[in-house]
UniProtKB/Swiss-Prot annotation:
Gene designation per UniProt: SPT6
Gene3D superfamilies linked: Nucleic acid-binding proteins, RuvA domain 2-like, SH2 domain, Spt6, Death-like domain, Spt6, helix-hairpin-helix domain, Tex N-terminal region-like, YqgF/RNase H-like domain
Name under which the protein is recorded: Transcription elongation factor SPT6
SUPFAM superfamilies documented for this protein: Ribonuclease H-like, RuvA domain 2-like, SH2 domain, Tex N-terminal region-like
Keywords noted in UniProt: Chromosome, Nucleus, SH2 domain, Transcription
Family annotation (SMART domains): SH2
Stretches the record annotates as Disordered: 1-247, 1632-1723
Length: 1723
């Protein structure tokens, strides 16, 4: 061979890449220095040096010419350096040589014979990726196994389960790569060489030799032996002695001469080794690793850890590897179940799959009970596929569906009927159960191995005295050998029986704990040996927890039993003999209980228990008396009974069937859990059966969460009657059947044993187990519910617009529209001041094409139009305006989207949608006119639909880093629009792209109760089901990172394998996959992964250009058909086209399929085939069920990869309202009372009724019609502006919700407010199991404790201030009584720790309380940094509050009291003064001031207009440095106050003369006796704020001139009728009648009566309509019915007459016969 032909080449070199020419030609395996090619000794630099003989000559000459002394020094230094380097590294290099033994082993494992032949090393034969043209008929008959034999050479490695080496194969029949894939060696998948990167094929055969030759050696000795072998081979390689001279064309004689002349090279070996080590160290120094650059967290995030690399290269689906992590998990996956184990697994799993399968197939009364055997067989077969063949659920559901259905033929209708044996969701459940059963088998094997170590087989081995330590039933040392043999066999039989019955990991743990109890130290020693690695085979799976699967991870890890030292100590004493005298053992008791017969009965000793126990007393073992001895013996027995696995299983079942749940709130829970708290639902639950928990899983999960928060105590227990019954059952099987005093005495001792076992062991164990069992059951139930919700979302396909459906109906258009063109529009929050409208357009392939921005899409208002006209006039028509609406229409006409998606997160989105719909209609009309579209079909094709889609994914996307990386040029709102458009085209794509943010999608509020990893697993399953159902176009995904996000959900793949797949296609196939076969032939995927994912990777044929002869497209690669089934569609197509084999000779096997799929009507041709008959023939001849497969092939040939998803629909109106506003049915519903702000008041007229426009906190617009604001409303009867004003806050009742317009109809009618929904804001309770009695007791108790706690806190609180005292109000008054006026006391408040009360002395027996709110508190006892007085201001400390707030009010009080018009604190003296002065001056008015004792901080301004007028009183409020009268609140002194009074009085008198109702006027209620104000003469009611209504008296939210504000009236609507519109409904409107008055009735809300000042009506004298009520001290009956006063509405008068006025007041209700139901004393 020429020199240029002997270029070193990799073992596996593709023909395309050069290197070795063809299979018949060998490769030079000897390098110029004698090294084998591929041995690892060469690199690129070495090859360059070897190719230059001159350079080699100079190096050799320089080497030989070295000085001897320098040579010795250098060599010594090199040797020292070499020794140091050997200590630092484990291995110099890997040996690639494969000898004859290796080839023999490979042939043996593959089952292929090989011919013994000395000669060159061989390699695997190669095949082609596609069958040759001259052998198409044979190719069509190939099975999938034969396809995979055609593995092409590749330099990376062979996709096999074991490591292998490829050799030239000219004349030896070695197994193909496909056969090696299925060789079945022990570490098939686990040790596969990386499928996507070069791995030097290290130690392929060497490790097998380790298994055989190094038996019995520990790990260090094995490693030393391996190192020695590597060193020997390396030296041989370096010296060339390992090379076969025949391979280099040198015969043995010439080779011997070379050795005689030059030696074997060992003399200069040190020099070569030193150079090699230098190069090794230099390479190691220069080599950069990930860990040298990135942090560990970054490496893990990028999936570059060693575990990630292992997952990539192992031939096991990634999701299975993640479900079973680590080496132990891999061993679990590798274990193949036998047919017997599969049958047992099927029986075990079939009862746990679902309630449906249990009810329909397993229940004898089930609908399909006759198909029970078919169901079990299907379960067994699916488990075989999952556990042995490692096939994932999507593959099984798609390609093994024939095994998942049972067919019955209806003879009457002559058609098949199908019964679903397993659904897709049930298959996922079965997958988890299969892994769990595998784990169970491994645990059993471990436990059996441990038992075999500690248990002595007395038949074959001698027994030592201390070896048979088997518990209390062990035979004593002096018994015969036969008895010992029998005891040993019985113990083994018991153990095996327990192990066979164990059906869960908990029961395996029970058996382990039982063995530990029985065998004590022996068991612990065996476990210690296992945990220390002495018996590695038994401990490989110790501690394995399958973390990813919900069913498997539900089971806790293998728990080690606790030590029972006291039991063991007593067991080694004579007390064990005493315990044995009680009768039967725990094993025998368990046998009696489970068999329901008394197989074993105890025999009573002949002495009484205490007398019999005397012989077992002794201080050595602590039994000083018979009582203590019996107690210790009973403790041992109860422990054995309590630890018996069978009895524990019985107790668990009892708890599962009969346990009850009781909840008791803690002290903290009583305070925290109110009626609005989510936990209020179960706050007082009692006796709820545990079996009902799955009906409401979220409730139980909330219970556990509340218990973790220390808010409740969760108790799960049995009823006394149930526990007593079970105790009797145990006792009856444990007690003796004897009668008499002696038997009774012993049976009482036995009863004590049973009770102790129950109390100490069985019941606590059952309680703990059931608690965790219910947790897992609840989680699984809730996960299934969320699974259904997610499936519903991801199963939606693209929107199908009216235009798309019209184009699909058009016969002129051949290509079917599947994906719409989308324009997404949003203005985000919808604030016109800052939010613009943004639009993003995507074409039908999902490509981002345009982004546009518009300031506003609303039509111009009349004012804006007028402004534009004026601007045009000013500029003489030269002004230019931007018409955003026209621009939007232009965009629609240009892009012609099929749909426009409108969404956002404000209520204004609904308005935007209406505007967009208008513009879309305009654009449609203009398109039709421009294109002259006349027919309905043509016009429909131009329709632009306006829709709304779910935006939860878009909201997540807009803030994500992924969005910023993909579209940095877009704003967040633009990215939001882009995500909306993508969602409209394919929801599953958007969900798949979320990645780790997937669980941020809230489908159910209770999903927060679930573990996030399990929730994500179920979400990914839902996405994976849809992704695999619709496939992934692999070549499109290669060019789109967005589409690549779906690859991890393909069966067999995952994030790591999908990433590796993309990289492999990019590097090996230049980024384009021509056909599916290349995935395996080019070593892109390994066998198992390919088997799972092949049919879900779609290859669109119109995107491909034919490559070379081998790599040609296959039309079937664009279908759901798996390559293993390609023969079926090929045969079907050929038959449908009437083609024969000779017609297809030399053609591609799928040519008939291509012709059929391109046919105009393939369905008609395929309908001629009898597929059912063909399926029957296949089953009869080959035993293959292929009916569903054949019908699936038929469907795919007609419509390849047809989208099976349902077309996407808009969210419901309720869902849209929640999207736009955040309101849900729990926050907004009819009958709810909500807080609204008045935005506009529209008065009524003859044309329309008046109304009030409001806005809710969520932005929803509301309307209050006048008739729902005022009872019996008529236009003109009352001014709505007199009732409410803009920016005022009201409480309104929701009458009706318009979900489409996002508006509500409201009412503020007191009558309707009274009928508010009682359940608003409250958490519904579990009424069936709610303990009312306990709730009432707890509430009373909690109220009392809260009161005491508040008092204690008040007493304990200390504030460092001279004015602070721990006083209550009474104590403060007592203290201030002797203090001067203006003294201040700061004290604790009854409102809580964040309030203070400031009490100051106004006058004798008059004290004002000021409520101070503390803000910014460090703790509950510290003083707040901000002290706020509501409506007055905030202060930084107490000194500032006293100086700037209290002292100025004291000054104003002193000013008033020193004024000449102040007449003291006695109201009678004030009235007497006014009356006397009026009598003296009958034609003049008079006024004076007095102190209001009922309302500290207020003065009374009382006046008489003339002698005959009644005394009226207006309130004067004292403010810091000011008085307040009506709207005037900055009156600096008494003079200013008097002037304000005169001004306001004159203004109201003028209004009264014009018969106009004063704005907000409110009358002073007439007293019951004496001095009554005429009903017409109303004291102005100041139900308005400052600056409103001129002279109105300041309103306080209740009827009357002035009163203390009613509770929570801060935002009440002022009104003249007693605060009927206050925040608390009708609290002041028409409450309880005055004492002695008739019951109140709903007021009829007419207009307010006119103000009639004294002296202004009826010519200035006494009012003509003044009622003749009796004066003070002169009681007398009123007239039968007084006349209706002038100007007063009759309904209003009737209301006053029947006592409907407000009763909330300060002062005493006179309520006498002469009153009208509630006047105020002295007013």
């Amino acid at each position: 061979m020429a020199d240029e032909e002997r270029v070193p080449a990799p073992y596996f070199q593709d023909d395309e890449e050069g290197g070795a020419s063809d299979e018949g030609e060998g490769v030079d395996l000897i390098k110029s220095h004698g090294n084998l090619v591929g041995s690892g000794g060469e690199d690129s630099s070495d090859e360059e040096e070897d190719d230059d003989p001159e350079e080699a000559r100079r190096v050799a000459e320089g080497f030989i010419a070295e000085d001897d002394e320098e040579e010795e020094e250098d060599s010594e230094a090199r040797r020292d350096r070499r020794r140091r380097r050997k200590k630092k590294r484990k291995q110099n290099e890997q040996d690639f040589e494969v000898d004859e033994d290796d080839l023999e082993l490979l042939a043996e494992n593959t089952g292929q014979p090989r011919r013994k032949e000395a000669g060159r090393l061989k390699r695997f034969r190669r095949g082609s990726a596609s069958p040759p043209a001259d052998d198409e008929a044979a190719a069509r008959q190939r099975t999938l196994d034969q396809i995979f034999e055609d593995d092409d050479e590749d330099e990376d490695d062979i996709r096999s389960g074991r490591r292998g080496v490829n050799y030239d194969d000219d004349d030896e029949d070695l197994p193909s790569v496909g056969q090696a894939l299925r060789a079945g060696v022990a570490r098939k998948q686990r040790e596969v060489v990386g499928a996507y990167e070069d791995d030097g094929l290290d130690d392929f055969i060497e490790e097998d030799e380790d298994d055989e030759e190094m038996q019995g050696l520990d790990e260090e000795e094995r490693e030393a032996r391996r190192q020695q072998r590597r060193e020997e081979k390396r030296k041989a390689r370096l010296s060339g002695s390992a090379a076969d001279p025949a391979k280099a064309g040198i015969d043995h004689e010439a080779w011997d001469e070379i050795h005689e002349i030059f030696g074997n090279g060992e003399d200069y070996f040190w020099a070569l080794e030193d150079e090699e080590e230098d190069a090794f160290d230099e390479e190691k120094k220069n080599k950069m690793e990930y860990k040298d650059i990135f942090e560990p967290a970054q490496i893990a995030e990028r999936m570059l850890t060693e575990d990630d690399e292992r997952i990539k290269r192992i031939d096991i689906p990634e999701r299975l590897q993640l479900a079973c992590p680590g080496e132990e998990g891999l061993k679990l996956l590798e274990r193949k179940l036998t047919d017997t184990e599969l049958f047992e697994a099927a029986k075990w799993a079939s009862t746990r799959i679902s309630q449906r399968t249990a009810a329909e197939f397993l229940d004898e009364a089930g609908l399909f009970h006759r198909q029970r055997s078919e169901f079990i067989n299907a379960v067994q077969l699916m488990l075989s596929y999952m556990l042995n063949d490692l096939l994932e659920v999507p593959f099984l559901f798609q390609h093994r569906f024939d095994e998942l259905e049972h067919l019955t033929f209806d003879e009457v209708e002559r058609q098949y009927r199908s019964i679903d044996l397993l659904t897709r969701r049930e298959l996922y459940t079965l997958s988890g159960l299969g892994l769990k059963f595998k784990t169970l088998l491994v645990r059993k094997d471990q436990l059996r191995a441990t038992f075999n170590k500690i248990h002595v087989d007395v038949k074959t081995e001698p027994i030592q005295d201390d070896e048979l330590d088997g518990g209390l039933d062990a035979m004593p040392a002096d018994e015969s050998r036969a008895a010992r043999v029998e005891s040993s066999q019985r113990q083994r039989a018991i153990f095996e029986d327990m192990l066979a019955q164990a059906a869960s990991l908990e029961e395996i743990s029970d058996i382990t704990e039982y063995l530990t109890l029985r065998y004590g130290q022996q068991m612990r020693d065996a476990q210690a040996l296992t945990s220390n690695g002495t018996d590695q085979a038994a401990s490989d799976l110790q501690g394995l927890t399958l973390t990813s699967d919900p069913l498997v991870s539900a089971t806790p890890a293998f728990k080690k039993p606790s030590l029972v030292g006291q039991y063991e100590r007593n067991k080694k004493t004579v007390l064990a003999e005493l315990a044995k005298k009680f009768g039967i053992t725990s094993d025998e008791l368990a046998s009696n209980v489970t068999s329901h017969t008394r197989q074993y009965s105890p025999r009573d000793p002949e002495e009484s228990p205490f007398k019999f126990a005397e012989q077992f007393t002794g201080s050595a073992w602590g039994a000083h008396s018979p009582e203590i001895a019996l107690a210790k013996a009973k403790m041992m027995l109860s422990q054995e009974i309590g630890k018996d696995p069978i009895l524990k299983r019985e107790m668990r079942q009892l708890f599962k069937d009969a346990a009850e749940i009781n909840i008791e709130p803690t002290e903290r829970g009583m305070t925290v859990i109110d009626d609005q708290h989510p936990y209020a639902n179960f706050k007082f639950i009692a006796n709820k059966p545990a079996r009902l928990v799955p009906q409401n899983p979220s409730q139980y999960l909330q219970m556990l969460q509340a218990e973790d928060e220390l808010l409740i105590k969760l108790d799960i227990d049995l009823k006394d009657v149930v526990l007593t019954r079970f105790e009797a059952r145990l006792y009856n099987n444990y007690a003796s059947e004897g009668v008499g005093e002696l038997s009774n005495a012993w049976n009482e001792q036995r009863r004590d044993v049973i009770r102790e076992a129950l109390k100490t062991h069985l019941v606590p164990n059952g309680r703990i187990w059931l608690k965790e069992f219910l947790r897992e059951e609840s989680r699984e139930t809730l996960l299934r519910h969320v699974d259904v919700l997610m499936t519903k979302r991801v199963q939606e396909g693209p929107f199908m617009s009216k235009s798309m459906m019209a184009r699909n109906r058009d016969p002129k258009i051949e290509e079917e529209d599947r994906i719409p063109r989308v324009l997404a529009v949003s203005h985000g929050g919808g604030d016109p001041r800052k939010d613009v409208v943004q639009a993003v357009y995507l074409d039908e392939r999902g490509r981002f094409r345009e982004h546009a921005t518009f300031d506003d899409l609303r039509p111009l208002s009349a004012r804006q139009m007028q402004e534009r006209e004026l601007e045009l006039e000013r500029t003489r028509g030269k002004a230019e305006f931007v018409d955003h609406r026209a621009d939007f229409v232009k965009l629609l006409k240009q892009r012609r989207p099929d749909i426009v998606v409108v969404s956002g997160w404000s209520v204004r989105t609904a308005e935007l949608k209406r505007h967009v719909q208008e513009l879309a209609d305009t654009a449609h009309q203009e398109i039709c006119d421009a294109d002259r579209l006349h027919s309905d079909l043509e016009r429909d094709q131009a329709v632009i639909d306006v829709v709304t889609c779910h935006d939860d994914v878009a909201r997540i996307y807009q803030h994500s880093s992924r969005a910023a990386e993909e579209f940095p040029e877009l704003s967040e709102l633009g990215r939001y629009c882009l995500a909306l458009a993508r969602y409209a085209q394919s929801p599953v794509n958007e969900f798949a792209a979320l990645g780790s943010d997937l669980t941020a999608v809230i489908l159910d509020p209770n999903q927060r109760l679930l573990p996030q990893d399990r929730l994500r697993l179920h979400f990914e399953r839902c996405i994976g089901a849809v992704v695999n159902e619709n496939g992934v176009e692999i070549n499109q995904a290669m060019t789109s990172t967005y589409l690549q996000t779906m690859l991890p959900f393909v069966a067999g793949l995952g994030p790591r394998k999908a990433h590796a797949l993309v990289n492999a296609i990019s590097t090996k196939l230049e980024g384009t996959l021509i056909n599916r076969t290349l995935l395996i032939s080019r070593n892109i995927l390994t066998f198992q992964v390919f088997q799972n994912c092949a049919s879900f990777l779609r290859i669109e044929q119109d995107m491909l250009l034919e490559a070379d002869e081998d790599d040609v497209p296959d039309v079937l690669d664009s279908t759901r058909i798996h390559p293993e089934d390609y023969d079926f569609p090929r045969k079907m197509a050929a038959d449908a086209l009437n083609k024969h084999e000779e017609d297809l000779e030399g053609e591609h096997p799928s040519l008939p399929c291509k012709e059929l799929m391109e046919d105009a009507d393939p369905a008609d041709k395929l309908n001629t085939l009898d597929l059912d008959n063909y399926a029957t023939m296949l089953f009869e001849r080959k035993g293959e069920r292929k009916r569903a497969t054949l019908h699936s092939c038929r469907t795919e040939l007609i419509k390849p990869y047809d989208d099976l998803r349902e077309k996407q629909s808009e969210p419901s109106l309720e869902e849209m309202l929640t999207m736009f506003t955040g309101e849900t049915s729990k926050t907004l519903a009819e009958g709810f009372v909500v807080s609204v702000e008045v935005t506009r008041v529209q008065e009524g007229n003859r044309m329309q009724e008046g109304h009030i426009k409001c806005r809710l906190d969520s932005g929803i617009e509301g309307t209050i019609e006048a008739e729902h604001a005022v009872e019996h409303y008529t236009p003109g009867s009352v001014r709505l502006r007199d009732l409410v004003r803009p920016q005022q806050t009201l409480d309104a009742l929701v009458r009706k919700i318009d979900y489409k317009m996002c508006t509500v109809q409201l009412s503020i009618s007191p009558w309707e407010l009274q009928h508010r929904a009682t359940h608003q804001g409250k958490t519904p309770i579990d009424i069936k199991f709610y303990d009312r009695r306990k709730a009432d007791q707890w509430n009373e108790h909690a109220a009392a404790k809260a009161k005491l706690r508040i008092q204690a806190r008040r007493q304990n609180r200390v504030i460092d201030h001279p004015n602070y005292h721990n006083f209550n109000y009474k104590a403060a008054v007592t203290f201030l009584r002797s203090q001067p006026r203006g003294t201040v006391v700061v004290r604790p408040s009854s409102k809580g720790d964040d309030h203070l009360a400031v009490t100051w002395k106004v006058d004798d027996d008059v004290y004002q309380n000021i409520d101070v709110t503390e803000l910014d508190k460090e703790s509950e006892y510290s003083l707040g940094r901000v002290l706020r007085i509501e409506g007055m201001g905030s202060y930084s400390d107490l000194d500032e509050l006293i100086v700037n707030h209290v002292k100025p009010m004291v000054h104003m009080v002193e000013m008033m009291m020193n004024h000449e018009k102040y007449k003291g604190a006695d109201e009678e003296d004030l009235h007497r003064f006014l009356t006397n002065w009026s009598l003296a001056n009958p034609s003049r008015s008079v006024y004076a001031f007095g102190l209001n004792k009922d309302r500290p901080g207020y003065f009374n301004l009382s006046f008489k207009a003339n002698r005959d007028a009644a005394i009226q009183t207006w309130p004067v409020k004292v403010l810091p440095n000011a008085f307040k009268l009506g709207p005037a609140d900055q009156l600096a002194d008494v003079a200013a106050l008097c002037n304000a009074f005169k001004t306001q009085y004159t203004t109201q008198a003028s209004m009264a003369r014009g018969a106009k109702t004063p704005y907000g006027g409110g009358r002073t209620p007439a007293p019951g006796m004496g001095g009554a104000t005429p009903l017409g003469g109303r004291t102005p009611y100041g139900g308005v704020r400052n600056g409103m209504a001129g002279s109105a008296t300041p309103g306080q939210g209740v009827a009357g001139g002035y009163t203390t504000p009613m509770i929570n009236v801060a935002s009440a609507t002022p009104n003249p009728y007693g605060g009927a519109y206050g925040r608390n409904g009708a609290a002041g409107g028409y409450g309880a009648p005055a004492a002695g008055g008739p019951p109140g009735r709903p007021p009829s809300m007419p207009g307010a009566p006119p103000m009639m000042p004294p002296g202004m009506a009826s010519g200035g004298g006494a009012p003509s309509y003044a009622p003749p009520f009796a004066g003070a001290g002169e009681p007398g009956p009123p007239p039968a019915r007084p006349p209706v006063p002038h100007g007063m509405h009759p309904d209003r008068f009737a209301q006053a007459e029947y006592g409907g006025a407000s009763q909330q007041s300060y002062g005493e209700n006179s309520g006498g016969a002469g009153g009208y139901g509630g006047g105020y004393r002295g007013y």
